[in-house]
Amino acid sequence: MMMTKQKNSLAERLNIGEEVRELKLGATFNPKNTSTAFHTIKYDFKPASVDTSRMASVDVGSNNQVTVTVPNSESSGVPHTVYKGNQREYAKECLMIYDKETGAITIEKLNHNIQVKKTRNEVTNKSVQLPGQNMGQPHNQGANGAAPVAVPVPGQGSGTAPKMENSTMRISTKTKVSTGSRRNNIIDFKPRNSPMQQNSPSRPVPVHRSPQSAPAWDANNAQQTLPSIPLITDDDDFGLRAALHNSGHGNTSGTAAGQPDFGSTSSSTHIGKQRQAPPHGHGKRQQMHQRLSPPMAQQQQPSNYGRGYNGGHNHAQQQQHHQRNSPQQQRPSAYGHGNSMPIDVDSSREHELTSQSVAQAAAALEQQIGGALSASSSSSESDSSDSDSGSDSDDSTEDDRSTQGQQQDHQQQQQQQHQVYQNHKHTQQQVAQQHHNQLPNLGLGSISPAYGSSHQQQHQQQMLPHQQKQKQQSGIYASNGGFPNDFLQNDLQLSSNSSDDDDD
């Protein structure tokens, strides 16, 4: 039943009756034929927009590569469709040609079988550029009737169906891979610019390094180098005054605050320049005290020393005044152990100066005592010459009174000299104590006690020959403040002789 229906349908379709027809062999069976050839082309997909009124082109390349270009209708928007594939030769396949006009049937051999597939270049480009249009293409093709055409075309050959499925699967896999890669790229791209990676431990390492190095060096160096600027220059008086003022008031606080370099340099300059200045300032002050020879002026001298002892700041101001008057300024060479030698040299200079000043004061006192004694002797002689009694007892009483007055004056002068010596010794101890307080961190703490003791010993050694010399030069008064017997006897003899002369 099925066969008859197919035959009937084929006979009806070709308009062939049940009669027997003659079959002719075509030119392809002729071995000398070189101009006629028949080929078959199988497409995996034929779009509905193909324009059948125009000719297609076939290009055969090397290695049996074939490119078929089929024109499309103008309404499709695509000028042509390109197919690419390969060819292979037939061995036993033939082609039967039926001529409707004559009714003749001819058999021809097939030379090559060409199988091509539609290239996905344009479609892939569209999928990459405009993915929305590719999603809408199956609906348009279904509306135009292209989808039913695509279904039976794979049925023409057994090998074309898996190829079509593979092609669609490849496209889907490509889109999946592309979307997956895009998602992966987006996932990888977000952490790169995300704040989580900015706060990662790899980047804060240089951020933590820069604050640890920069403030430690800049702050410490600035604090250590700034105070040393006025100490370097020799001509800067303002820097020296500031250094002396700071050393006089806050050396101990500066060293306790953690600046040993500044305290040591300022104190060293204070000591070095304090000991350079006294040749001018201290000498002038001693000359001023020597000029005030009366006892009242000498009594003012201990009061000045007492004021200097009570107010340490006045002594520092006097030292600054002496430093301004001093023409020589030396740079402090002292860092470390080099301070011990200049201190010993300066201390010896101060001892010499103080000894000279004490010697000058003692000489002035000797001159005053000598003048007072000469005046008393002259007055006693005048009194003895004017007296008419002539008695030795009256002369002796007058001489005793004059000698007692001189002894009292001499005792007062000795007490004043002793007070001057004690006040001077006290001020020297005060200066030594100030030096000891100003040098807490120089390692010179052991020098100041030795300095005070050596100062006292040297002063005592220098005062002993001076006292001996004073005793030898004076020779006028005894050790207890009175006059010796020889002088009294000579005075009595002179008074008696003068009285005898008056009697004669």
Curated annotation (Swiss-Prot):
Disruption phenotype: Loss of adult progeny and reduced male-female sex ratio. Pfam families: EAF (PF09816). Residues 174-184, 248-271 have a biased composition (Polar residues). GO terms for molecular function: transcription elongation factor activity. Keywords: Activator, Developmental protein, Nucleus, Phosphoprotein, Transcription, Transcription regulation. GO terms for cellular component: nucleoplasm; super elongation complex; transcription elongation factor complex. Residues 174-218, 242-504 are annotated as: Disordered. The modification Phosphoserine is found at residue 194. GO terms for biological process: cellular response to heat; positive regulation of DNA-templated transcription; transcription elongation by RNA polymerase II; wound healing. Residues 383-398 have a biased composition (Acidic residues). Residues 200-213, 304-334, 404-438, 455-473, 488-498 have a biased composition (Low complexity). It is found in: Nucleus. Component of the little elongation complex, at least composed of Ell, Eaf, Ice1 and Ice2. Promotes transcriptional elongation by Su(Tpl)/ELL. Essential for development. Belongs to the EAF family. This is Ell-associated factor Eaf. It comes from Drosophila melanogaster (Fruit fly).
